[in-house]
A protein has these predicted regions:
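Substrate-engagement module of ASCE P-loop NTPases
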Residues: 7-15, 51-56
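Glycine-rich anion/phosphate-binding loops
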Residues: 1-11, 46
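Non-transmembrane, interaction-prone segments in cytosolic or luminal domains
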Residues: 3-7, 16, 87, 106-109
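Active-site capping/gating regions of soluble enzymes
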Residues: 32-137
Length: 137
């Protein structure tokens, strides 16, 4: 976990020195396994917290990055699959607990999900909350 964070921090620093906007990606495998949605949220929060601490330790200008990450979802072999509204809530919770407000953008990976599966949490969140999401969706 920390090795990836250090590599990404060095990459981000080098990009910024040369006037580029780095797209940084923490190493979070959320789709494989039998973990619950709650466990995915907890692990995502922990990894993102460590990730951003390392970026800050390296002096990365957080206002000049894009975070590329996965949504918090239960594992493929979980006893209870994740509902779209729960994925939206869990993902927003993990991000709001760990991503500094200075980060201007988040790009989501599919995490092995289909396009329809990826879109459902976003659509659910926007139907329920309008376009407002604290800047995350």
């Amino acid at each position: 976990m920390e090795n990836n964070a250090h590599l990404m921090a060095r990459y981000a620093s080098a990009c910024q020195v040369h006037g580029l906007v780095p797209i940084v990606e923490p190493d979070i495998d959320v789709i494989n396994g039998s973990h619950s949605l709650d466990k995915a949220t907890q692990v995502s929060t922990q990894i993102l917290s460590v990730f951003f601490k390392v970026l800050q330790d390296y002096g990365v200008y957080l206002e000049g990055i894009v975070l590329k990450t996965s949504m918090a979802v239960a594992g493929k072999k979980a006893s209870q699959p994740s509902l779209p509204q729960d994925v939206a809530k869990a993902t927003l919770l993990a991000l709001s607990r760990s991503v500094p407000p200075a980060v201007p953008g988040v790009a989501f990976l599919s995490g092995g999900q289909t396009e329809a599966q990826v879109r459902k949490p976003f659509h659910h969140h926007q139907r329920r909350n309008g376009l407002s999401s604290g800047g995350l969706f």
